Amino acid sequence: MGAALALLGDLVASVSEAAAATGFSVAEIAAGEAAAAIEVQIASLATVEGITTTSEAIAAIGLTPQTYAVIAGAPGAIAGFAALIQTVTGISSLAQVGYRFFSDWDHKVSTVGLYQQSGMALELFNPDEYYDILFPGVNTFVNNIQYLDPRHWGPSLFATISQALWHVIRDDIPAITSQELQRRTERFFRDSLARFLEETTWTIVNAPINFYNYIQDYYSNLSPIRPSMVRQVAEREGTHVNFGHTYSIDNADSIEEVTQRMDLRNKESVHSGEFIEKTIAPGGANQRTAPQWMLPLLLGLYGTVTPALEAYEDGPNQKKRRVSRGSSQKAKGTRASAKTTNKRRSRSSRS
């Protein structure tokens, strides 16, 4: 490679001198255009002036034989030098590859399938969170450091803050706004519904209550004894039994006493169509008022159900009875005595 570089230096120097002597450029000499132009001039001199030798024609043009030889042989020399450089470079690259391959032979041969599982990774896999797992918070610290340039901390700080503000405006504010609108709409709807229930006029309707009262009366008037027993008593006495009455055979002398219907007590009830009177807050404070039976509904709409109201609706919590230590010790004593008696019995049976 050193010899090729030396030849290249000599060729460049010769071509440069020829270009300075003739006025042609180096590119024209390397391409062969200068040699073709000189040959045309020599041919014209031979035709016009009758010059027969090349040396006389070269001298007539004003060139030396060395310069003419350099100009005429420069294209071929450059082509041969290029081929030489390509050959030397290819051989050197092949030699370099072979040297690296054979020098690193032990490292390039895979031994994974010999002593380990086949298909195992040749390099260790370190995830992005590897150092953050070993040192929690290091990635956040490094990222924050990279955001600010110590040399130009002012513009970098302004760019970072403006970028964070833009992300907040673009991503966070729409989500927060939609959530707040949803909360306000839900709150407004609940408040409007609660105020509507407070201000509306309520009327008593006994139709559903009467239906449940009829069902309650029907099941309360049923006989505590089976109908087959009533038929047996009626057949024995020869009387007719009308079902649907209340029967009682306790201390009864005849079936007439059994089939007597119980007199229902006349209960005072509120008639349908009556309006519930609205109460006004005392003292003229114009506070919001509601009947007691409406409080669970209103407080449930506002989401402020108190523990006392929950106990009123669901009933008191049933707590488990705690067993005292004395009773547990007594129970243990009885168990121990039972075990000892069983042991004594087994001993007596063995003996």
UniProtKB/Swiss-Prot annotation:
Keywords: Capsid protein, DNA-binding, Host endoplasmic reticulum, Host membrane, Host nucleus, Host-virus interaction, Ion channel, Ion transport, Late protein, Lipoprotein, Membrane, Myristate, Transmembrane, Transmembrane helix, Transport, Viral attachment to host cell, Viral ion channel, Viral penetration into host cytoplasm, Viral penetration into host nucleus, Viral penetration via permeabilization of host membrane, Viral release from host cell, Virion, Virus entry into host cell. The chain crosses the membrane at residues 289-309. Residues 312-351 are annotated as: Disordered. Residues 341-351 have a biased composition (Basic residues). One of its GO terms (molecular function) is structural molecule activity. GO terms for cellular component: host cell; host cell endoplasmic reticulum membrane; host cell nucleus; membrane; viral capsid. Residues 312-351 are annotated as: DNA-binding. Residues 272-307 are annotated as: D1. A lipid is attached at G2 (N-myristoyl glycine). One of its GO terms (biological process) is viral penetration into host nucleus. A motif (Nuclear localization signal) lies at residues 315-323. Belongs to the polyomaviruses capsid protein VP2 family. This is Minor capsid protein VP2. The lineage of its organism: Viruses, Monodnaviria, Shotokuvirae, Cossaviricota, Papovaviricetes.
